UniProtKB/Swiss-Prot annotation:
Family, similarity comment: Belongs to the OmpP1/FadL family.
Keyword Transmembrane: yes
InterPro entries: OMPP1/FadL/TodX (IPR005017)
Membrane topology, from the record: Multi-pass membrane protein
Record key words, sorted: Cell outer membrane, Membrane, Signal, Transmembrane, Transmembrane beta strand
Protein name per UniProt: 47 kDa outer membrane protein
Gene Ontology cellular-component annotations: cell outer membrane
Record's subcellular location: Cell outer membrane
Main subcellular localisation: membrane
Length: 428
């Protein structure tokens, strides 16, 4: 099959890193696994057993829960990402829509040593949206990716102080992407008469598909005493092998000339293809230290193996490479520090700060304007009864200003986001 367009490379690259926008972690990883964690910027996430949400990060923590428990909630993400450019028509405000990230978890202690649990959370996913008449439609149109993680885990208390956990992950990923002609296409492919007549909102590339991927996770917890413990969690890479359809509305009359520019015209016809999307492995180490009867400190260091992702390669059904695009992501780190205070037996307040490092190095795009970001978080838990409680959390994310070029067009992106979380916990 012939080589696809430079635009198509940008399109499928967006499928890889769509969630980077502003929502949470580096590249296309989401951090929003619990509302209680949100309130402390996820500091101590692999060592704190607030509720059944421990399933999402460190399954070994299930050994600390003494009663069956469920946790249900959601985090509302309100991003604000703006682009500026010295080129007329390429600036754009609010490229990422709001989103709701749901979470559902349950833990069931079988006896003093064994516990099982499961959960559902969105660990990858966001969207970027540009108007179909945007001048840079060739670079940024509509991108939507959701990766829902289903987890089943078990925990075993090896000794009075040491526990281990193991889990299986099934991830269902669904992607839909569109790009438009805009004016950038004519700049990129000049002197093609048939393109001059294309309206800016002409769909020049469309891709959609869904697929399952599978992985595993493990964790351990060591309790020095009732007030101090550390936890380590590891989540394996999950490989998603998308199978979907690609099409564009380039006129077939211009096919031969477009081919010299590296563009395959389909005239609206769909072409089947595959795309490998790796969701990288990561590990996290956390600590929890109760300094007084009411005050505790907690911290985390998280390391994600983005450097495993070297390139993005799409293939046709005949096995031939449609394109290969160098990504060269770098490993990223996240550090977080938080504190909790029990105001009363019924009310706990918490706060945290975190620094989240970008995984993108030299390959930023307007669909994925990844950048370093700082978290500022506050939250609280209120216990109505010993068995019923609610968590509330808020975080403000401030991204570092980022200047880059895509296809020769200069851009500067500024990103921030507000996250609002609410969760209900019930013990049986």
């Amino acid at each position: 099959m012939a080589k696809t367009s430079k635009f198509t490379q940008t399109l499928l690259a967006s499928a890889l890193a769509v969630v980077a926008g502003s929502a949470s972690a580096a590249a296309f990883q989401l951090a929003e696994v619990s509302t209680s964690g949100l309130g402390r910027a996820y500091a101590g996430e692999a060592a704190i057993a607030d509720n059944a949400a421990v399933v999402a990060t460190n399954p070994a923590l299930m050994s600390l829960l003494k009663q069956p428990e469920i946790s249900v909630g959601a985090i509302y993400v309100d991003p604000n990402i703006n682009l500026t450019s010295p080129m007329p028509g390429f600036a754009y405000k609010n490229i990422a829509p709001n989103a709701l990230v749901p979470t559902v978890y349950g833990v069931y202690p079988i006896n003093e040593k064994f516990a099982v649990g499961g959960g559902l959370n969105v660990n990858y996913g966001l969207a970027t949206e540009f108007d179909d008449k945007y001048a840079g439609g060739f670079l940024g149109g509509k991108t939507d990716l959701t990766a829902i993680n289903f987890n089943l885990s078990g925990a075993y208390r090896v000794t009075e102080k040491f526990s281990v956990g193991l889990g299986l992950n099934a991830v269902h990923a669904k992607a839909k992407l569109e790009r438009y002609a805009g004016v950038a296409l004519k700049l990129k492919v000049p002197n093609v008469a048939q393109l001059a007549a294309l309206p800016a909102n002409t769909v020049i590339s469309k891709l959609q598909g869904d697929k399952w991927g599978f992985g595993w996770n493990a964790g351990l917890v060591y309790e020095f005493n009732e007030r101090n413990r550390i936890g380590i969690a590891y989540h394996s890479q999950v490989d998603i092998n998308f199978k979907g359809q690609y099409s564009n509305h380039f006129p077939l009359a211009a096919a031969a000339l477009l081919q010299t520019k590296g563009i395959t015209a389909t005239g609206g016809k769909e072409i089947p293809g595959t795309l490998h999307l790796p969701l990288p492995a990561y590990w996290e180490i956390s600590g929890y230290h109760k300094m007084t009867d009411r005050f505790a400190m907690h911290y985390s260091y998280k390391y994600t193996q983005w450097s495993k992702f070297k390139e993005l390669r799409a293939k046709g059904t005949d096995g031939k490479t449609l394109f290969s695009k160098t990504e060269e992501f770098r490993d990223s780190s996240r550090i977080a520090l938080g504190a909790s205070y029990d105001v009363t037996d019924a009310l706990t307040v918490r706060t945290g700060i975190a620094y989240d490092e970008s995984a993108a190095d030299e390959h930023n795009t307007i669909s994925i304007p990844d950048t370093d970001r700082t978290w500022f978080s506050v939250g609280a838990t209120y216990r109505f009864t010993p068995n019923v409680s609610i968590d509330a959390g808020f975080a403000h994310l401030k991204g570092k200003k980022n200047t880059f070029k895509e296809e020769g067009v200069p851009f500067t992106s500024k990103a921030s986001a507000n996250l609002y979380g609410l969760n209900v916990n019930y013990r049986f």
